[in-house]
Swiss-Prot record:
Domain of life (superkingdom): Eukaryota
Gene3D superfamilies from the UniProt entry: NAD(P)-binding Rossmann-like Domain
Single GO molecular function: oxidoreductase activity, acting on the CH-OH group of donors, NAD or NADP as acceptor
Protein name: Oxidoreductase-like protein SRL4
The keyword tRNA processing is assigned to this record: no
Taxonomic classification: Eukaryota, Fungi, Dikarya, Ascomycota, Saccharomycotina
Residues in the signal sequence: none
Its job: May be involved in the regulation of dNTP production. Induces the SOS system when expressed in E.coli, therefore, it may play a role in DNA metabolism and/or in genome stability.
Matches recorded under InterPro entries: NAD(P)-bd_dom_sf, SDR_fam
Family named by the database record: Belongs to the short-chain dehydrogenases/reductases (SDR) family.
Active site: 197 (lowers pka of active site tyr)
Sites where the protein binds NADP(+): 39, 60, 67, 152, 197
């Protein structure tokens, strides 16, 4: 009984924010997909404009160009990746990242390739023809394969470098994976996108478990953030600023586990309570 209660309390303390917390002055944020979708753009601008935090953005296009965020050139660095489905392009981007003088301590995986397909009333690809398979392969390579490779690279090559060089205040790392609530319920459209995000859910669970078991000096906290469902592109654009602020607030609090963006509850809230109750039955 005591052992069970202890485990629940440890999980609770991790969840509410002990350990690593985002520090605007000491942390540098690496965003994967920071300018090819509305949320990425808002995240870049929120970190730079509101918190004066250094941001590294890896994406296919730099649509932050011309925005207010670009006024602070010292805070914003763009790394081009022409094609996230091409491993060679990813390797070139990672090499560029590794050679930068600034080193990220917070990694946000925000790949949202194919998210617009979830806005359709009916799935675009009802049959697995060649077009459907090609689209599926691209979405999975963008949203899942690239995230896995970049995360592994940061854990193996980037974070250890920070650990060795950074001051005590900057030690500790955050990995944030952005998924979708659509992975948690049946949906009639956007199946390719949703499948890729289901893969992200599994990868997040795996990397979290690996970091707990691995004999490493790295202090890495993980968080999976679920996007809400969107009714239209206008709805997605309208919610992105508040979603961005919600996510940053979670990092400031040192949230661990999971959170549903634009919601006061998380999956972790329910699981924690359920787990605590079941320990007495």
């Amino acid at each position: 009984m005591k052992k069970t209660i202890y485990k629940v309390l440890v999980s609770f303390y991790q969840y509410v924010g002990l350990g690593k917390k985002f520090h605007p002055s000491h942390d540098t944020v690496l965003i994967i997909g920071g300018s090819s979708n509305e949320l990425g753009i808002e995240l870049c601008e929120t970190f730079i404009e509101d918190y004066h935090t250094k941001v590294i953005n890896i994406d296919t296009i730099d649509s932050i160009n011309g925005k207010n965020a670009r006024r602070s050139e010292k805070l914003y660095t763009f790394i081009s990746c022409k094609d996230f489905s091409d491993i060679k392009c990813l390797e070139e981007s990672m090499l560029y990242l590794q050679n930068l003088e600034i080193i990220p301590t917070v990694l946000i995986n925000n790949m949202q390739e194919g998210i617009e397909s979830t806005l359709l009333k009916e799935d675009k690809f009802l049959r697995l023809d060649e077009e459907s398979l090609n689209e599926f392969e691209k979405i999975v390579r963008y949203n899942l394969q690239s995230v896995i490779l970049i995360t592994k690279f940061c854990l193996s090559n980037i974070f250890p470098k920070v650990q060795a060089e950074a001051q005590e205040k900057a030690k500790g790392f955050y990995i944030v994976n952005i998924s979708s609530v659509l992975t948690l319920k049946p949906c009639k459209s956007g199946t390719h996108f949703i499948t890729s995000k289901c893969g992200i859910n599994s990868f997040h669970d795996g990397i979290t478990s690996e970091l707990k078991l691995k004999d490493s000096n790295l202090n890495v906290k993980t968080l999976i953030a679920y996007l809400p469902s969107f009714e239209s592109e206008a709805h997605w654009k309208r919610l992105s600023p508040s979603i961005s602020k919600h996510l940053v607030h979670c990092l400031l609090e040192g949230r661990y586990g999971d959170t549903i963006l634009e919601s006061k509850r998380s999956i972790g809230d329910i699981l924690l309570i359920t787990g605590f109750k079941s320990s007495f039955t």
